[in-house]
Amino acid sequence: MHLLAFDTSTDALSVAVMRSTPTGPLYWQHQGAGGAAASGSLIAAIMDLLRQADLRFQDLDAICFGSGPGSFTGLRTACSVAQGLAYGAGVPVLPVSSLMALAQTARAAHAPEVTQGCVIALLDARMHEVYAATYAFAGDVWTTLQAPCLLAPEQVAAWAQSAGAALGADKTLPGYKDGQPGPAKETGLVSGEERAPLLLKVQIRQTQQGPAPWHAWAGNVFGIYSERLAAPADLICCNALPQAMAILQVAPALIAAGACVPPEQALPLYVRDKVAKTTGERALEKAAKAGIAHIEAASAAAHIAQAAAHAQTSGT
C-alpha cells in the first residue's frame, strides 16, 4: 500500500509518505511551519517526499489528511490540497481526525508495547478553550469514546471522568477504577470512529491478562492551561502534536473499514462554529473596558484628592 499523509491543523506542518516493499513499508517524512505558512510549503514538501519515495500521485492508494479540529486556515489548506491532488490523480481521500492522530502519536512515543489503554487528546483551541476527544485502544483497534468537542480548560477533568460512565457500571475503561482516573505518572489505529462502547468492553476483557492498561492525557495544552486543567497529580501527561506518521499508522485499518471518501466528500472537521467576535460584540467589549477604565480613573482621582486633603490637614 502506498500512502501520502499530511496534517496542518496546528502550528506545525507534518508530511509523510509510505511505500510498500516486499520486505516491509518504507517511510519518508517532513516537518515544517504550519498554520498559514503551510499554504506556501505543503505542496513543495509533498512533491519532494514523493520524489524521494519514487512514487507518482497515481501510484497512491489514498491521500490522507488531518481533518481537524484545529486551525481554520490550516484545515482549509489541508482539505483543499487533498481534494485537488485526489481529483487530479483519481485516488480516494481519507480524512483522519487530528485528535485521533494525536492519540496515536502519544501512544507510539510513550507506550508502543502496551496492548490496551485510553488517551484523552487535547489541542489548544485559543480563546481560552481546548479541543478534546477520548480514544481507547485494545490491540490495534481504536474506538472513539467521546467525539471531538470544545471545552473550557476547567471542564476537562469532569468531562474526562464521564468517559468511564460511557462503558457502563463495570467501569472497564483503561486507567479508571470506580469511575475515577487510576494511578499514573508523568512522562516527558482505528477501525471505525463510532464503534459502540460495548464492543470496546469485550475487547478489553479479552486482553485483561496482558500488561496493565495505559491511561494518558496528550496534547499541547499543559504549559498553557496547566493550573486550569486540574489534572490528577499522578496522571501521565504527554506533550504531543498530530503527526503525519501517526496518520499513516492508523490509515490501513481505516481504509480496510471503508473510511475513504471521494474528493468532494472530504471536508474539514469544524468543532467551533465561531472564530471571531462580531462587530457588536467588539463594540460592547470596548465599551465595557472604557467603562472600567473610567471607574478606575475616577477612583484614582478620588484617592489623590483624599490624600491631598489629608496632607493639607496634617500641614495645618
PLM segments and residue spans:
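Residues at secondary-structure transition points
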Residues: 33-41, 72, 76, 80, ...
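Phosphate-handling active-site elements
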Residues: 52-58, 86-96, 114
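N-terminal beta-alpha supersecondary unit
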Residues: 1-67
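Acyltransferase
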Residues: 223-224, 237-316
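DPxDG-like acidic metal-binding loop motif
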Residues: 64-98
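Surface "functional belts" at beta-alpha junctions
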Residues: 21, 37, 92-242, 275, ...
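Conserved hydrophobic/aromatic positions in well-ordered beta-strands
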Residues: 4, 16-18, 131-135, 269
